[in-house]
Structure formats: structure tokens, C-alpha cells
């Protein structure tokens, strides 16, 4: 979470959004750095757990956060503007083994649609950078299934941003035994 926040280049007092906040790991790290954190998740039970996590931490450190149940596909309905968005979005169900190929292809198509819609919404509300994780699936036929990230970015009005020549984007973030590989992208508006 700390790496993601740092890649978002947020400064103390700025506001970040995690539209897939889950149990609020990214929000906690942001708030510890003095960044105002807003989290949205479509699972009310998960929002309840996130609230418990943030309240526990808040009693010791901070209270600069806000949680709300909601749909990441409708962000502009909930949020006017944020400085940055930092998130690990929904990556599909948990897999105990490599993904069946046909399922991976269907999931890829679903996630491409979801991410395009969400990034279009993010485009309406974000002032600066977006840190977004895209998955790649290892399949049962030893073929990897990747999302068409170029199309997603083109359709949503974003491009890849690289803060330094020494940092190559995307940043691979996974264990060799992972069934879902994660790639961290830093995005900016076109």
C-alpha cells in the first residue's frame, strides 16, 4: 500500500480516492501519511470491516478518512474532485490454482468493460495521477491471458505516466507461484 501511495505522488493534505477500497489497506497508509482518504466499495459488509480498521487506527493516529458504500462505475455521482486515485480494483474471484483458459478469457472481457467504465468515471473527478493495478491470468493450459490495456486507456482518456527514466511502467508485482499476476500502472489524463 505504501508503494502505491508513493507512486501516486500525493502530498500531505491532498485527497485520494480508492474506489475499490475493500478493508481499507490503501486508505490506512494514505491517512498515516497525512493524506485525506476516501474509500468506496460495493460490499456493505466489507465497508463495515474497513470502518473498524480505520476507527482502530484513527484512535491512535488520524481521522482524515471517509467511507461510503457505492458503485465504482458511478464515481462522479458520489465525488466531485480528488487529487489522485490509488486502487487495486476487483481482479476476479480468488483462484487456488491456475485459471481455466475459457474462464480467464471471459473474465478478461468483463474486467476490460468494468475498468473502462471506472476509468472514464475517474477521468471526470481526478486532478492528478491514477495508480491502477491490472491483472494477467495464468491459465491451466500454461498460456497467460492479459487485458487489452492500450484499448482501455484509449477509451477512457488516459495514458501511461513514468515518473523517472529509471522506473519502467508497468511495475510487475506478484510471486512466481501466483495465479493472478499484478501490474502497477501510473496513469495521467491525455
Language-model features and meaning:
Residues 1-190:
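Class I S-adenosyl-L-methionine-dependent methyltransferase catalytic core
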Amino acid at each position: 500500500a505504501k508503494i502505491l501511495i508513493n507512486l501516486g505522488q500525493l502530498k500531505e493534505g491532498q485527497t485520494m480516492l480508492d474506489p475499490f477500497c475493500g478493508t481499507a489497506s490503501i486508505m490506512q497508509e494514505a491517512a498515516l501519511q497525512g493524506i485525506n482518504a476516501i474509500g468506496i466499495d460495493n460490499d456493505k459488509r466489507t465497508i463495515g470491516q474497513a470502518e473498524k480498521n480505520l476507527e482502530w487506527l484513527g484512535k491512535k493516529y488520524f481521522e482524515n478518512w471517509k467511507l461510503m458504500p457505492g458503485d465504482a462505475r458511478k464515481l462522479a455521482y458520489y465525488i466531485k474532485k480528488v487529487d489522485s486515485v490509488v486502487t487495486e480494483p476487483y481482479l476476479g474471484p480468488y483462484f487456488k490454482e491456475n485459471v481455466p483458459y475459457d474462464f480467464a478469457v471471459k473474465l478478461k472481457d468483463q474486467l476490460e468493460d468494468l475498468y473502462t467504465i471506472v476509468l472514464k468515471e475517474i477521468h471526470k473527478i481526478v486532478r492528478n495521477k491514477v495508480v491502477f493495478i491490472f491483472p494477467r491470468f495464468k491459465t491451466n493450459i500454461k498460456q497467460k491471458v492479459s487485458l487489452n490495456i492500450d484499448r482501455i486507456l484509449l477509451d477512457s482518456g488516459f495514458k501511461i505516466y513514468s515518473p523517472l527514466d529509471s522506473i519502467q511502467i508497468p511495475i510487475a508485482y506478484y510471486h512466481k507461484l501466483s495465479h493472478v499476476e499484478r501490474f502497477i500502472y501510473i496513469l495521467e489524463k491525455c
